Amino acid sequence: MADHVQSLAQLENLCKQLYETTDTTTRLQAEKALVEFTNSPDCLSKCQLLLERGSSSYSQLLAATCLTKLVSRTNNPLPLEQRIDIRNYVLNYLATRPKLATFVTQALIQLYARITKLGWFDCQKDDYVFRNAITDVTRFLQDSVEYCIIGVTILSQLTNEINQADTTHPLTKHRKIASSFRDSSLFDIFTLSCNLLKQASGKNLNLNDESQHGLLMQLLKLTHNCLNFDFIGTSTDESSDDLCTVQIPTSWRSAFLDSSTLQLFFDLYHSIPPSFSPLVLSCLVQIASVRRSLFNNAERAKFLSHLVDGVKRILENPQSLSDPNNYHEFCRLLARLKSNYQLGELVKVENYPEVIRLIANFTVTSLQHWEFAPNSVHYLLSLWQRLAASVPYVKATEPHMLETYTPEVTKAYITSRLESVHIILRDGLEDPLEDTGLVQQQLDQLSTIGRCEYEKTCALLVQLFDQSAQSYQELLQSASASPMDIAVQEGRLTWLVYIIGAVIGGRVSFASTDEQDAMDGELVCRVLQLMNLTDSRLAQAGNEKLELAMLSFFEQFRKIYIGDQVQKSSKLYRRLSEVLGLNDETMVLSVFIGKIITNLKYWGRCEPITSRTLQLLNDLSIGYSSVRKLVKLSAVQFMLNNHTSEHFSFLGINNQSNLTDMRCRTTFYTALGRLLMVDLGEDEDQYEQFMLPLTAAFEAVAQMFSTNSFNEQEAKRTLVGLVRDLRGIAFAFNAKTSFMMLFEWIYPSYMPILQRAIELWYHDPACTTPVLKLMAELVHNRSRRLQFDVSSPNGILLFRETSKMITMYGNRILTLGEVPKDQVYALKLKGISICFSMLKAALSGSYVNFGVFRLYGDDALDNALQTFIKLLLSIPHSDLLDYPKLSQSYYSLLEVLTQDHMNFIASLEPHVIMYILSSISEGLTALDTMVCTGCCSCLDHIVTYLFKQLSRSTKKRTTPLNQESDRFLHIMQQHPEMIQQMLSTVLNIIIFEDCRNQWSMSRPLLGLILLNEKYFSDLRNSIVNSQPPEKQQAMHLCFENLMEGIERNLLTKNRDRFTQNLSAFRREVNDSMKNSTYGVNSNDMMS
């Protein structure tokens, strides 16, 4: 330890500086010194001294957090005896010092929880020494309220700690601990918590007493943590509320069949202050979400009846719901009524008619008070959406009454949104229309609700639309109209256009009638008439939100009524013909294109409208029949012949805008490329005519690059716009004929300009990203479009350019030096990721024979591969998995390299090989299934290569192993632990996890076993011996059957036999391990 950290007094002073000082320099120096202290050899003993003799709470906090780090480290872990001593010391410390600062108590409880979790499978004299949590806290629970709070908090924190995976330990180990804790301890903790809550609620708690206040809060947190436990390892995304089934184990059935458990929480809700109620309701949300299969039909009906009664009681006494947190949780509870139970079950509940009336009134009132808890509306709309969607399927004879209440909900939503417009504008409030994501989510829900009793929805929309449209027209014609009045009507019309688009988008083909299609026609006519009015005023004024609503409407209309699947006899088209003279789909498409051109002309500098407009054009260009109709329109021919900034301002070089604003150009040119291809065929003149603006742009950049001094900003903007345009065209040209025209146009004339741009601006991702993405698209053999003639060297020439760009970018980006963590992806890793994708596309495109490079002394392949290695070694392992796009590009490239270029992998330095193998090992447990599957494939190729080389080396052959293979074998023999670790990981996942890619996992496993037969035998014995005595024979038999009929080779027939055996093995092991609470006491299995 450093000299200046010698005494406790000095340590305490450093803690004070760290937590109290306002001077940044002093705090940083204290932090640095304390980091040294944490890493020092005598940290453990000093921590104990700080806890024993420290005079400040900060020094106690430091000691607790340092000890937590010490027990959590994976390298050089503390011995078992020492960890037992720390656990016992912490419990005694908490038991003898009830008056510690809250944050110190919390830190010590966290330390206890961490030790317990990480030592869950540690044994001493056949005793799992860290599994006595309930015994550990009993003495706290039998003491005063202060001690009782500590005991409950320990259980709560432990449950939470075991439920959460951490990045420093493998996910397989986490799931193993969580499963064992669930089976051995969690139900006892839940039962204890409920019993303590019953005792507390029966005692008429004195909630003015701060300590009793705290006890109730901790008990509710503990109960919620138990119910919120990830029982089967599926809750990887905690932000999602959609997967709302709680997978309660069958052994918990008794607690939920007993109605007093449910009743306890409803009673608590009514008897405690509103500040505690949100936690009670959170528990009820989880209880309402228990899996359906926990009950039989009669039990479920009884449980649902109690649940509905409890909800009814809350709705009849809604005073506490004025608290936003209570209201939010109660809305979540209502949503679970339909997500977990069927409408046919709900209508059979005795009080259903009264409850559905109360829920409808509550929903209508909530929607009318739109400014109160807007984030909770999602749950209410979710309930009604699910109810409405169930109406066609309900078979129960009891009335569901939704035909009465659903229109009320629809009306409340529509009228409340319209009424909000004036208040928001008058008071300068935040406009919900600004949050298009939230609006879209609500409209998706309303689309189903509104189609229930659709004639009522349409009548309301027609009435409201006509009123607003008439008022709007009158205001526009009036010279004295105030801007405020115009803005109000535009806001109302914006909501109505969004809602009309939504209800049209909610049309379901099998449930729609001619009358409903005619109603859709009425609504569409009105929106198109409004569009004609607003478009005629665009030269003077426009409303961005209304335009975005129009685009949303067009998108919904396109999905339902335009395309190959739509019946052209639809009553909607008849109505459009009568009112607007639009007789068929081609005429409607001309309206679409007219609107698209108008938007691009008048809104070219408004990014949201431009990008949505271009997305609409792009979607139209995908349909087989619609794209052929579009090409015949004069407006589309105008676009194909005049795609310049003169006609479309967003294509201009605007020095005020950001370079990233040009992204939409790719979408534009993808659509134009598809439209051009319809009639292009082999017409090179038409192609060259189309490319004239891009040719001029390339020539302009070439001219700038040829001079020593040029306007860098102008050059950057011209080039970035150009490469984004080209990428759109390259993506659209997925046929050989058209793509060859593009290739011959760009190579060799313009390729040097792209290389020069990378050379000049490698440090500016706004320039390099579009250039690299264009190159990655050009080398992508999409739809086999890169098929060169047998006499053409173009495949090799294209790869040379690819290699040159990767090498140039890679060597220069590595000169950036240290990049701040928050900028490392944008400045470095994103470009590297695209290079990996580019190299993968080139290597797997099947248009280059890579054997010729070495044969003719061409270093293009070697340069690209060596640059890949340099770039890879500059990336920490953690980053490879932390950034999803980088993960996918790296592992898919590695898959190609291990499949086709194993000789290159074998020739690498030992530390590089170990780096690659480590990355595969870590990727095997990745949450992303694509990454995990890719790693299995890489591992399979490596193991197969190793096995073949090993087989050859043992045979008497005239041709010896080449130098690379020999060295690779030697490295792997020196470091068997890496392959053994992966064998252990794969086996662990197959046996103990919810393995979603079992076939992929099975492919490398046979090779791993054949390469490590002794290790596999030890591992098998370890797993068998870890089972309860009565299950060991069954487990042994499972392993015997796994290798039944398997030969010592990796021929396809043998592999397939093994894969079949493995499927049976997994089923048998799962059956054998059911009801077993024992874990695998093996360091290899757990690491």
From Swiss-Prot:
A single GO BP: mRNA transport
Modified residues (N-acetylalanine): A2
Top-level lineage group: Eukaryota
GO MF entry, a single one: small GTPase binding
InterPro entries: ARM-like, ARM-type_fold, Importin-beta_N, XPO4/7-like
Family membership noted in the UniProt record: Belongs to the exportin family.
Annotated protein name in UniProt: Exportin-7
Species assigned in the record: Pongo abelii
Lineage of source species: Eukaryota, Metazoa, Chordata, Craniata, Vertebrata
Gene: XPO7
